[in-house]
């Protein structure tokens, strides 16, 4: 009598794996095509001029602000960022320096973080993560974050918590 091949025990496992795969794949004939993963609202690229339109001055507009080049919809915090609110000066622009220094001085309401101390940079990262990213949806990025000064793509750009962001959608 011939001995079975040493891999004979793999056949039942392969059959089981095939059966499980067939059960998990919906039948196209039954009209059950797999649905693509749900995508959040698309993010977009904002110029400084476009971002300025969302400063909280218009009642029917959302309120956006940017920190570290990431644009957040802070409309749910209208009492903080809306017209006449205590932090309205931060809205409608990238105010990274002001956030880092905890300053509302007009000279600090800029994206420029050059010259900040290590403590201020740490505060910026902390507020960025624990306040803005934790509380408010990301709606886009500033052009400055995605593009270099000469208009070429910033090869170091990495989206923040937006796996559905595709830079080619912006061009």
From Swiss-Prot:
Residues 1-30 form the signal peptide. One of its GO terms (biological process) is MAPK cascade. GO terms for molecular function: growth factor activity; metal ion binding. InterPro entries: Cyt_B5-like_heme/steroid-bd, Cyt_B5-like_heme/steroid_sf, MAPR/NEUFC/NENF-like. Keywords: Acetylation, Endoplasmic reticulum, Heme, Iron, Metal-binding, Mitochondrion, Secreted, Signal. Residues 151-171 are annotated as: Disordered. Transmembrane segments: none annotated. The modification N6-acetyllysine is found at residue 135. It holds the Pfam family Cyt-b5. Gene3D superfamilies: Cytochrome b5-like heme/steroid binding domain. It is found in: Secreted, Extracellular space; Mitochondrion; Endoplasmic reticulum. It comes from the Eukaryota. Residues 157-171 have a biased composition (Basic and acidic residues). Residues 43-128 form the Cytochrome b5 heme-binding domain. GO terms for cellular component: endomembrane system; endoplasmic reticulum; extracellular space; membrane; mitochondrion. Belongs to the cytochrome b5 family. MAPR subfamily. Non-classical progesterone receptors involved in extranuclear signaling are classified in 2 groups: the class II progestin and adipoQ receptor (PAQR) family (also called mPRs) (PAQR5, PAQR6, PAQR7, PAQR8 and PAQR9) and the b5-like heme/steroid-binding protein family (also called MAPRs) (PGRMC1, PGRMC2, NENF and CYB5D2). Acts as a neurotrophic factor in postnatal mature neurons enhancing neuronal survival. Promotes cell proliferation and neurogenesis in undifferentiated neural progenitor cells at the embryonic stage and inhibits differentiation of astrocytes. Its neurotrophic activity is exerted via MAPK1/ERK2, MAPK3/ERK1 and AKT1/AKT pathways. Neurotrophic activity is enhanced by binding to heme. Also acts as an anorexigenic neurotrophic factor that contributes to energy balance. The cytochrome b5 heme-binding domain was proven to bind heme, although it lacks the conserved iron-binding His residue at position 81. Interacts with PINK1 and PARK7. This is Neudesin. It comes from Rattus norvegicus. The gene is Nenf.
């Amino acid at each position: 009598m011939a001995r079975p091949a040493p891999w004979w025990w793999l056949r039942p496992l392969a059959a089981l794996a095939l059966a499980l795969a067939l059960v998990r794949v919906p039948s196209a004939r039954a009209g059950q095509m797999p649905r693509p993963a749900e995508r959040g609202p698309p993010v977009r690229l904002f110029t400084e001029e476009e971002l300025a339109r969302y400063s909280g001055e218009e009642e029917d507009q959302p309120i956006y602000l940017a920190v570290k080049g990431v644009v957040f919809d802070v409309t749910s915090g209208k009492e903080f960022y809306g017209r006449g609110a205590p932090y309205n000066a931060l809205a409608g622009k990238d105010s990274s320096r002001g956030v880092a220094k905890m300053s509302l001085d007009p000279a600090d309401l800029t994206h420029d973080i050059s010259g900040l101390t290590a403590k201020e940079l740490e505060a910026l990262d902390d507020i960025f993560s624990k306040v803005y990213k934790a509380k408010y949806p990301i709606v886009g990025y500033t052009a400055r974050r995605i593009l270099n000064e000469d208009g070429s793509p910033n090869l170091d750009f990495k989206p923040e918590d937006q796996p559905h962001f595709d830079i080619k959608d912006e061009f």
